Every structure is written in structure tokens, then in C-alpha cells.
Amino acid sequence: MTFGYKLDEDGVTFNLWAPYQRKVKLKILNRGIYEMERDDKGYFTITLDNVRVGDRYKYILDDNSEVPDPASRYQPEGVHGYSEIISPDFEWDDENSVKVKREDLVIYELHIGTFTSEGTFEGVIKKLNYLKELGVTAIEIMPIAQFPGKKDWGYDGVYLYAVQNSYGGPSGFRKLVNEAHKLGLAVILDVVYNHVGPEGNYMVKLGPYFSEKYKTPWGLTFNFDDAGSDEVRKFILENVEYWINEFHVDGFRLDAVHAIIDNSPKHILEDIADVVHKYDKIVIAESDLNDPRVVNPKEKCGYNIDAQWVDDFHHAIHAFLTGERQGYYSDFGSIGDIVKSYKDVFIYDGKYSNFRRKTHGKSVGDLDGCKFVVYIQNHDQVGNRGGGERLIKLVDKESYKIAAALYILSPYIPMIFMGEEYGEENPFYYFSDFSDPKLIQGVREGRRRENGQETDPQSDCTFNDSKLSWKINDDILSFYKSLIKIRKEYGLACNRKLSVENGNYWLTVKGNGCLAVYVFSKSVIEMKYSGTLVLSSNSSFPSQITESKYELDKGFALYKL
């Protein structure tokens, strides 16, 4: 590793890239201060043989300020405190990784701090058997890079190599991955390479880590294409390898790649994909551009990412079922939108968007369905609502089941948001734990203005209210388990060669020898096939269908043809 420190038989070698500094000293707490040697690229290096695991350190800069290591492996006292030397040793018995094929992926997105009452890696470990029984094949963990305080979504992280101290630190995360692997569950880590958080970022004093040309609304964005960008790219790519080698993660979710601007001949996303694929892992991107370039192979000038999120799919179902038309939902709302998303993935694939006031997106062509991840809830779509309401609070139970079937039985990769599978009713708010009064006030006002959030993001109550209650609705949980089982048994993944028909309030999807029937309001449907009932959301559906007309109540049914 180029950045941070390295332990070997000669001692500990520290390496800091800080070209803005003329001199840097290493301060080992309670041991001493040592002058570091600078090379012509701005790297400061020193090897010490009197340093051991558990020692804490900072760097002293030209102005005598002390800063933590930007590649710190652990920040036991938070983003402003000393960095700590940790041992990479761990007794792994997980056989290194779980290799899950895209067509077998059923993802479960969770936030460590609110998934259990403990809010720790250990708390998640206690629920792994439950997740295995649910039928998911991978857990996707929201960012765990060290952020300010003890409560945050994770997207305000500032130490990309340091595991959040309040969650259980690096040893706790290693244990979680190890235990997940023993049950055959893959671990996908959500990482943020489009920006760093607004508090605790000392890299600005060290070198050109951040772009002077591009901005994000969340914090400074990394410099991937200007002077000094070679070292910044290395900093990011080594971070990818770090999570794979040191923590055995099986894949990554890249946050908001539309906010990663890189005009280099080779885009950083392609570089990231190359590193991930070198280790036979997977990488998934969040993008709101509706651009197949993200997942297209290199021979089609793509970045070769394995899959990308599809917000259009969510918006179509949400707007149709709830009737909401505010904000971006104004572009959606008809049953035809659901049909188009089933057929073409993106609804806006070169169409004019009234919300954006421009043409948006591009056709995905014949890319297979497992290049795309769909959902009816996620941390953004729930947490960026003013009241943090989950879908279960916005629609009736039958509509909720219809929504679940629409995405779990789709040809795309389904992603469940924690608690959704049993009808969790607690809200999921945005919360933070900053210490800067001006920043705190800015966040409060911004969330109120942009999202209508009246709850205080800094309040412990907001955080605690967002924790799962684990009050399980057995009927909904059983339905989710059945959907996941059917998806696997009937091989419904990836194949986009479907026959989709619809009326004003109903939709049928035929493929893989099955017919899925979705009835949004009592309707008469003329069936063109004969089949046997496999699963239904209620008892109103006939056990057998033939080529005739049926008056069906609201709900969902799947028939084997």
C-alpha cells in the first residue's frame, strides 16, 4: 500500500502524500516527534522500529497544526482525533469470499446504526441467520468509512480507509464479514468516491486531492483529471483493494457516480471496475443519468460496471400506487410507465422529461436484466422524504404486496431495504452528528428547505426513531420469502424477453413459463393461457385459469403455464 503505514520486520513505515507541505513531522503519542523525509512527488516517509500496534499518531504540518492520517486505518476518537495503528491479523475461516453470480443476487440494503437496537456490527451478526432464512444472497452495507460523531447515513465520511469506530471498528467489521461468509451471504460495501464529508477533512491542507473545477452539493469532489490526479486515483484504487484484501468484501456499491466527473482518457470508473474484476468481485453503481455507458462493456465504450440502479422503475411504481406527483414524481404516474420499465428498463431513454426540462437518458438496447438493480424502497427514496415514511404507510397492504411482486419477480436484480420485507412502519430519517455549529444549522435549514424535514437531523430522537422496531407482520414476511423462493426456482432473473400486456388497472407479464397477474383495482381480464396457481397475495384468485374472462379483485397472482 502506498498510503498510510505498513508493518513489517523492520518496524512501521509511514507514508503521507502532502505536496503542499515543505516539512512534515510524525508525532507518536507518548513516544516522540520524528522528522519525515520528502521526495520530489511530495511523499513524506519514515520507518520506525520503536512503534507498535495500538500506538496513536498524527502529522505535524508547516504551520504546526496536527492532522490525522488521511489513510488512517482507525480513528478511535473520531474524525479530529489521533489515528491508531492496528494489526491486519484476523483468524479468517470464511474461505475468503462468497462468489455470487449476478443472476443469483437478491440484495438486502442495511444501515448498521439503525438495523438493530445495538447499532453495531455485532448486532447485525445476530440477525444473519434471519437474513439467510429470508432468502437474500447479499447484504449491502451503507458506508462505514469514519464520519463525524456516532450517527450518520455514512455519506459524510472523511477517512476512506478507517472503519467507523461507533460501529465496532475494523475488528468488528472483519468479524461480520467472516460470519456472513460462513452462511453463504456475500457482503457488498457502499463506498463514496464522489466527495468527502464537510467535517474532519484535513486533506485540503495536504495536496490537490480535490478538484478546483467540479463541485458537489455534499462536499469537495476528488480530483481525477487535473494536476496531481495520478496520486489521487491511486489513493482511490488502493482503497478498493484494501477493502478486498483486508476485509474480504465481495463487491461494492458506488455512490452517485453521476457526480464523479473525470475527463481523463480512461475514466476512473473503468479503472475501479478493472481492479474489482481482477479479484473476481462485483461492482454496482448508483447513477441517475439513465446512461447504459455505465454498464456497457469496454468494446462498446462502456465503463464495464456490473450493474446499475434504476430509479425510473421505483418512481413508476411509487407514483402509480401512491398518486404522488411532487418533484420528480411529476414525470411518472401511468400504468404505461410500469410497462415501459419492464420492457425497456429506463422510462426516460431519450424522452423529454418535464421535470428536468430536457431530453433525458438513452436506450439500453439488448443488455440483459441483471445489469440493473431495482427496488421499491431504499435509503434515499425513504430518507429523503420529509417525514421519512416507508411505502407501507402510504399504500394499502394489497398494493404493498403488488409492488413487492413487481420488482422481486422482475428480470432485474432486486434490492430490499431493511425492514421492508416484514412491513416495518418506523420512519427512516436523515440524521447527522456534526460538531460545527454553522454546519449543523446549515444542514437543518437545508433539509427543511429541500426535503421538508421538520425533525432535527442532529437529535438523538431522530436517530432512535429511525431504528427498526422488528415488529414483524408475519403475512408480509411470508409473502416476501415466497417471492424470493419463486424467483430462484423458476429462473426469473435476467431474461428481458417478456410478453407484457395491460389494461387501465391491470398488468400481466409472461415469461419463463409463468404468468404474473397484477390487478391494481377490480378488473375483468381475458386470459390467453391456461395455468396453475403458484402464489397469490390473497384468496380471491382462482387455483386454475383457462382461456376465458375473469373478474379479479385487487391483488397479485403467479400461474405456472
From Swiss-Prot:
Changing R356K: 2-fold reduction in specific activity. One of its GO terms (biological process) is trehalose biosynthetic process. One of its GO terms (cellular component) is cytoplasm. Gene3D superfamilies: E-set domains of sugar-utilizing enzymes, Glycosidases, Golgi alpha-mannosidase II, Immunoglobulins. Its main location: cytoplasm. Changing A259S: Insignificant change in specific activity. SUPFAM superfamilies: (Trans)glycosidases, E set domains, Glycosyl hydrolase domain. The active site is at D255, E286. Keywords: Carbohydrate metabolism, Cytoplasm, Glycosidase, Hydrolase. Optimum pH is 5.0. The record marks D380 as: Transition state stabilizer. It catalyses: hydrolysis of (1->4)-alpha-D-glucosidic linkage in 4-alpha-D-[(1->4)-alpha-D-glucanosyl]n trehalose to yield trehalose and (1->4)-alpha-D-glucan. Optimum temperature is 85 degrees Celsius. Pathway: Glycan biosynthesis; trehalose biosynthesis. Its EC number is 3.2.1.141. It is found in: Cytoplasm. GO terms for molecular function: 4-alpha-D-(1->4)-alpha-D-glucanotrehalose trehalohydrolase activity. Pfam families: Alpha-amyl_C (PF09071), Alpha-amylase (PF00128), CBM_48 (PF02922). Substrate binds at residues 253-258, 311-315, 379-384. Homodimer. Belongs to the glycosyl hydrolase 13 family. NCBIfam families: trehalose_TreZ (TIGR02402). PANTHER family: GLYCOGEN DEBRANCHING ENZYME. This is Malto-oligosyltrehalose trehalohydrolase. It comes from Saccharolobus solfataricus (strain ATCC 35092 / DSM 1617 / JCM 11322 / P2) (Sulfolobus solfataricus). The gene is treZ.
